[in-house]
Amino acid sequence: MSKSKEEALIQCAIAAHLGEKNIMIPNVSFARTSCRVPKHGNNGQLIGHEYPLRGVRHEADLIWINENDYLTEIEIKVSYSDFLADFKKEEKHLTKYTRAVYYAFPWDMYKENEEKIKKVLVEKFPEAGVIIVGMGGLAVSVIKNVEYFNAEKIPIEVKIGLMRIGCQKWWRWNA
């Protein structure tokens, strides 16, 4: 579940805006068991699991898998202090499958802190893009494009694992 109703509203607004040809999944923990791939022996019997995201420990507020099987992470920040706290964490928002990272903000919070946010991003994460959501979640705008990372396409087994997580979460959201 989202940390706040405002975060959930932003997740849904972005998903509605981008979701037509994309897979949008909220609150994905990249911990070891969140995305495991079954391994089968020659006779088809399950012999264990592989963990393609082993060692990754962060949680993404929203992930977006495009129709070409590239993953973009969207970090939703509803306060300036939450945004700053992101840069104090050891774990960064990157996996071998992460092609891009956006920060999403409510319009009013972004406008109030725009220059400070821009300065932090230039210094700490210049590749990140910026999305703002305003008017009760009805308006979604990309105001800074991302710089893409050299990333692997998501293998079908990992994509299915992430979609399973999404199916377990979206139905819980209520506005």
Residue ranges and their predicted role:
Residues 49, 100-101, 146:
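Intrinsically disordered, low-complexity segments enriched in small/polar residues
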Residues 30, 64, 107, 170-173:
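A residue-identity detector for tryptophan
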Residues 68, 111, 174-175:
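Short, isolated positions within intrinsically disordered regulatory regions of eukaryotic proteins
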